[in-house]
Amino acid sequence: YEIASCLVGSEMCIRDRAYKIVFVGPEIIDRDNILNATMSGMKQAAEGLDIVPNLVLVDGNRVPAALEIPAQPVVKGDATSASIGAASILAKVSRDRYMMELDKQYPQYQLAKHKGYPTKLHYELIDQYGIQPFYRRSFLKKQGYWPEGK
């Protein structure tokens, strides 16, 4: 909790640490699939750091292909590694902030309330107001929320 509040409240808490936030847009996820898009984002983040790390720890069972920095997968890494846990918090806080910005542009979707997660309310609002460019087509198709032929 202390780390989470610190990160939410002030970027100064992490000023002496190397980190990079990379957003991968829905069009990339739809084109490449969620796993490949995630791996590409991780590679961009690791290789885009101002400080080159000795080792990249990746939460999961695989590492990005062609990563030019030594990397090690850590299954359930967010529960066992402070570095991975901190990265997970940064990712969550960044995503939530992005949803808050989208909420200002699309208030009818109440993104500040459900943060874009597939809640009953969110699906009801999609039914009512339609699909916007920030939605992943691949996810909505799987859920039956994307018109055929689009």
Residue ranges and their predicted role:
Residues 1-14:
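Single conserved hydrophobic/aromatic residue that forms the stacking wall/gate
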Residues 1-3, 73-79, 101:
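Short, well-ordered junction/capping motifs at the entry into regular secondary structure
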Residues 16, 45-54:
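Phosphate/pyrophosphate-binding loops at sites that engage ATP/ADP/AMP, CoA/4′-phosphopantetheine
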Residues 18-20, 54-56, 70-72, 88, ...:
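Structural motif
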Residues 18-44, 127-150:
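C-terminal domain-closing interface element
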Residues 33, 37-40, 55-80:
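Catalytic beta-strand/loop module used to bind and position nucleotide/cofactor moieties
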Residues 37, 41-49, 87-94:
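Stable alpha-helical structural segments in soluble proteins, enriched in small hydrophobic residues
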Residues 79-150:
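Oxyanion/phosphate-interacting regions
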